[in-house]
């Protein structure tokens, strides 16, 4: 006769989801109840650890491990990270989000095994590369986003994406019909993005000054002669000027949905736009030393090719598309600066600003 090695077996399930709304248990729970009708079911009482998790600093570690880990010894930390630390904005956000995840990724160097496939991250990487390539081409040839014809823009996008796809991952993008479809989809996204950039710039007087502007800045000196650097790339810096001031707008391209969140910024979870603005202002001050450098906007452009429903004409379709492509983020509350970014009236289709009947801007401001 077989004997069980454990006295009791427990199966648990959540009563509430992440949004604290009630959720139904898995169908497996119902099956077990039918198979074992004598199984007892009860709600676990709140434990001290649950209260401690909410009320006591670092209690989450106590709850999950039962002990507080010691800080790495100096020698081990130096062996892992070295005396010169270089981190991206993403790595800073990772540390603020989960220090253990940061340790695994940047200390131990752990990562998922690479597979021969075209992943979601690759889609965004190629789109960024195409937008950068075409944007620099426009600037180097003294062309204008605003005046670029649809045919010329589409041709530049096709040439750029074909060249990048040919050299990407040993032609991984050419090995299936699905990936060929993705190439066409990326062309549509890139073309729509560059079209939107032209429309948005046409409504104001800001003009692109730099694309994919890299930076490497020493943050501070740490104990034991450790140096700390932050690196990154700013997707786009737009500027405009008057007699005394230079106004700076930072735009970051995202393939997902992103918006400025003050609470996450405060806790270090989303510091990208603020960091980019700081570096952009330093960069522009070196070029325009005699002017005051004024931040105008921190904006995300979410890359997409929206489909809209319209019953009237092409103008209505364009207006709806531009509304879907409106940038998100925060802008300077100065009305004159806002009009430099968008001189149109009413609710802007370019930036997160709308005007009331008293002609006062309703905005997200910095």
PLM region descriptions:
Residues 2-6, 359-363:
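Short, small-residue-biased leader/transition segments that mark boundaries at the very start
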Residues 3, 7-36:
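C-terminal accessory regions
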Residues 16-20, 36-358, 365:
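Structural signature of nuclease core domains in nucleic-acid processing machines
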């Amino acid at each position: 006769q077989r004997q069980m090695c454990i006295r009791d077996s427990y199966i648990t399930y959540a009563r509430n989801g992440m949004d604290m709304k009630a959720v139904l248990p898995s169908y497996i729970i119902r099956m077990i109840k039918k198979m074992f009708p004598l199984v007892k079911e009860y709600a676990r009482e709140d434990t001290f650890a649950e209260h401690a998790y909410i009320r006591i600093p670092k209690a989450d570690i106590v709850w999950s491990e039962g002990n507080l880990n010691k800080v790495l010894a100096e020698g081990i930390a130096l062996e892992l990270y070295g005396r010169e630390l270089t981190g991206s904005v993403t790595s800073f956000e990772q540390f603020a989000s989960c220090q253990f995840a940061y340790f695994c990724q940047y200390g131990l160097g752990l990562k998922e095994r690479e597979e021969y496939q075209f992943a979601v991250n690759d889609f965004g990487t190629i789109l960024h590369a195409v937008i950068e390539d075409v944007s620099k081409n426009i600037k180097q040839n003294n062309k204008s986003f605003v005046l670029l014809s649809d045919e010329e823009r589409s041709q530049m996008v096709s040439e750029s994406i074909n060249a990048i796809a040919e050299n990407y991952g040993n032609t991984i993008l050419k090995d299936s019909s699905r990936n060929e479809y993705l190439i066409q989809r990326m062309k549509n996204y890139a073309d729509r993005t560059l079209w939107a950039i032209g429309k948005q710039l046409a409504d104001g007087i800001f003009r692109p000054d730099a694309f994919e502007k890299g930076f490497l800045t020493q943050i501070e000196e740490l104990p034991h002669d450790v140096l700390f650097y932050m690196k990154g790339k700013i997707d786009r810096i737009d500027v405009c000027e008057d007699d005394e001031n230079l106004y700076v707008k930072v735009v970051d391209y995202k393939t997902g949905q992103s918006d400025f969140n003050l609470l996450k910024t405060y806790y270090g979870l989303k510091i990208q736009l603020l960091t980019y603005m700081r570096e952009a202002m330093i960069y522009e001050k070196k070029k325009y030393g005699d002017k005051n450098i004024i931040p105008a906007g921190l904006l995300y452009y979410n890359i997409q090719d929206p489909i809209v429903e319209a019953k009237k004409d092409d103008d209505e379709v364009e207006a709806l598309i531009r509304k879907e492509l409106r940038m998100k983020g925060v802008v300077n509350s100065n009305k004159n600066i806002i009009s430099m970014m968008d001189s149109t009236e009413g609710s802007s289709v370019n930036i997160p600003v709308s005007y009331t009947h008293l002609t006062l801007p309703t905005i997200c401001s910095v």
